[in-house]
Amino acid sequence: MSGKCATLKISGHDFGCRAVAYFHSEKGRANFTVALDDPADHSHIIAFSGEYGRRTQDDLYMLSIDRMELNSKDRPKMDGLPVPALELSDGMCRQNGNFARLEVSSITCTATDKKGRQYQLQFVSDGSPITVRRVRASAPTIRHDPYQ
């Protein structure tokens, strides 16, 4: 989604954002993921995550947040990628717009983790159509690894 973060706060600290994306897994978990504009850490990513999303109107999607996923350059890596820390949280995300029409006008998220840290996001679209990509897990296509 293209646009700008009018607000992005983590524990009272203000950040800019480089990108905002929505992910929905085949198992039902959904995330609003934000890549932070943090010159000290290009791996600084947070995700507002939950399993109970619902469309209350044609142009309003709500996601109950039950955990925050926190990633940074200091996190342990698996297959070369940082593994996020999971913080149990309570919150809500509201997306105004319609995925079917490729229109999202805004996303607002607030959450508080069990340690009392607060997370806030206010994203405003620039009006461009969103890009939708469908990614599915599949079996490996390499039958024998020649490097083993």
Which residues are covered by each model-predicted region?
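A mature extracytoplasmic/lumenal domain signature
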Residues: D38, Y52, R67-E69, A111-D113, ...
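Short, well-ordered helical secondary-structure segments
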Residues: A21-F23, A35, G80, N96, ...
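An ectodomain-focused feature that recognizes extracytoplasmic/extracellular
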Residues: M1-M62
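Acidic, glycine-rich flexible loop segments
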Residues: S64-L121
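A signal for specific C-terminal beta-sheet/loop modules enriched in small/flexible residues
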Residues: A47-N71, R75, G80, V132-T141
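C-terminal partner/receptor-binding element of secreted or periplasmic proteins
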Residues: R101-Q148
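Glycine-centered flexibility motif
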Residues: G12, G91, S138-P140
